[in-house]
Amino acid sequence: MRKLLAPIAAGALILSSLALAGPASAHNARSHEALAHLSGETHIPPGNPGAGSHSQNMHFRSTIGPTGFTNSDIAFQGRYAYVGNYGGFRVVDISDSDNPVVVANVSCFGPQNDISVYGDVLVVSVDSPLTSPACGSPPASPITLETAWEGVRIFDISDPSAPTFLTAVYTKCGSHTNTLIPDLNDDRLLVYVASYPLRAGPDCGPHDDATDTHNPLHEQISIVEIPLADPAAASLHSEPAIEVPTWDIHDHIGPNPAFNVMRGCHDLQANLGLGLMAAACAGVGQLWDISDPANPATTSPIWEVDRSEIDFYHSALFSDSGKTVIFGDEIIAGTCSTLADGDGQMWFHNRTDGALVSTFQIPRNQGSDYCSSHLFNNIPGVRGDVLVAAWYAGGTTVVDYSNRANPKEIAFYDPTGGSAWSSYWYNNFIYSNDIPLGFSIVHLSDPARAGADRLRYLNPQVQ
């Protein structure tokens, strides 16, 4: 279903390891990985990044190996990759693709440790009530405003080999993901925080106290302001309301008192040139006007899509031309064993009105493995439109969608025992952070990469 809402604008409680094994396995193994991701579980099966299947135009180059934690998102700046995991993050010198070097391994537990960088500033998301924002803090119990913290941590990375914790900002429902927008006119960074109350937090989700006035469904994002002159003075800027439908996980897994219904966003993809944001908000995908980034029009979306075939609007991307908005569906229960079912697809929409153009599913049968689109970005500057995507057990896929009506996989890398969380193109190579296998570098030799732009830095959630 598509709703055109306005003219186009110009220009969780962290779970201990395997805590969900009972509820998830009671449903089926296919949904376990999605529940683990949504709720913060850490489970590391074995695997081999150098083995498995790949297309003739994709070649494994190197890896720095696993961390012992769930590996998550990546940001890039210069010759460094900043590689998140639930236990902290690693800084990797990627100047030699055959011999990446870990120059810093920061131990700072806080799922998901979704990561963004700009200049000397690094931001990580913590979606898990801890006893304090300090690195080394354990999960909080009880979870109250007096005893628990979750939100964003901020580090100084002026010396990439020695990141230094600066400060932290509490945000309601924590921070599942973050989108860092430079607002250089005002000498600051604005960090959009997406979160949701799938599990209750200190002032997030259902509550028993009749005097508590917080909204149990959440229905907001948060914006954190970081002054460039003094990042340690970061603070909560605002809490813009959102208008999205209630998403009920029980529709997908059956009754389970461990999880809450909610209204919130998972990923926020910014296109700064267009002044737009594609908001993936569980039960709906929306397009927002962010031409004034400090005052986004979050309650009056330009359009929204809420297709019943989609389990969970998880992530988004604009084509380089700006003509197309892509939403990724993270399935809660499904596999790629029956490709015709279309579980976990990408959905391609017109940017101007939200009309559906096409969908894409990887063409490789993955049996009973959990298989779903996850995180992705474009290969910038090439002729046509080409993206790189992580597909959990489907590995890393390269998709040519120059013909929007007929997107096609043109390359893939699918390591044994892998489950790709994030896969991105950055300066001539593809970098994948795999849940069990860790960070790997892959080379794409396809002609579709010709002419790709080199970037000074990359936060994949910002274009």
Q: Predicted regions span which residues?
A:
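Secretory targeting and sorting signals
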Residues: R2-A26
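Feature marking well-ordered beta-strand scaffolds used for ligand recognition
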Residues: A26-Q463
